């Protein structure tokens, strides 16, 4: 089981008299995720234990992507440079169509298309904003896209039942 969310830094101020609100969208946005693995035998669990302990809490990073977020046969190459914090890129003239809700990778980070993009040199709108500047000609990766992650806390643990089956649940945040 995988629970994913996009966390945003948004400030909200509400009047105690009129309940009118004002919002301010700060730059912060990151993916967060909790993963629960199916029950594993001792032999299967050993490598998971070693991996989690080897991360040394929040100090280590790793790549991870949702195994169901795979879109084969889609190709989008950037037609121009894209600055950090951008939320759209212009595809090259041979770029494929992309449906809203499609995940992709640029550099070390995961993004989701927020609107349909038609084939050709059109804008691909996405969230969260770019984490790094991207050069023209860079290709978006739609095949098992991943992001760079770290554990969300320094505690590691797992459970074992009477049948010697191991259970793992761990939380992670995008490593920015």
Task: Describe the residue ranges of each PLM region.
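Short, conserved charged micro-motifs
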Residues: 42-48
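Autoprocessing Asn-cyclization modules and mimics
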Residues: 46, 54-106, 115-120
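Oligomerization/assembly interface segments of phage tail-like spikes and tubes
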Residues: 21-42, 160-176
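N-terminal targeting peptides, primarily Sec-dependent signal peptides
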Residues: 1-13, 33
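Short, solvent-exposed beta-alpha or beta-beta edge segments that form flexible loop/patches at the rim
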Residues: 12-20
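Small/polar beta-strand repeat architecture
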Residues: 1-6, 66, 73-74, 95, ...
């Amino acid at each position: 089981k995988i629970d994913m969310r996009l966390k945003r830094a948004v400030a909200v101020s509400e009047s105690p008299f009129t309940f009118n609100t004002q919002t301010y969208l700060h730059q912060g946005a990151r993916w967060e995720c909790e993963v629960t693995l199916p029950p594993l035998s001792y032999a299967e669990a050993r490598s998971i234990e070693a991996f989690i302990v080897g991360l040394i809490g929040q100090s280590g990073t790793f790549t991870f992507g949702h195994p169901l977020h795979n879109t084969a046969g889609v190709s989008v190459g950037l037609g121009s440079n894209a600055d950090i914090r951008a939320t759209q890129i212009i595809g090259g003239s041979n770029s494929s169509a992309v449906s809203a809700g499609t995940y992709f990778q640029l550099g070390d980070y995961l993004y989701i298309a927020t609107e349909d993009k038609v084939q050709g040199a059109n804008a691909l709108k996405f969230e969260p904003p770019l984490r790094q500047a991207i050069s023209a000609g860079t290709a978006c990766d739609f095949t098992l896209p991943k992001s760079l992650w770290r554990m969300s806390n320094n505690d590691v643990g797992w459970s074992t039942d009477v049948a010697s089956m191991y259970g793992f649940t761990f939380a992670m945040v995008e490593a920015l």
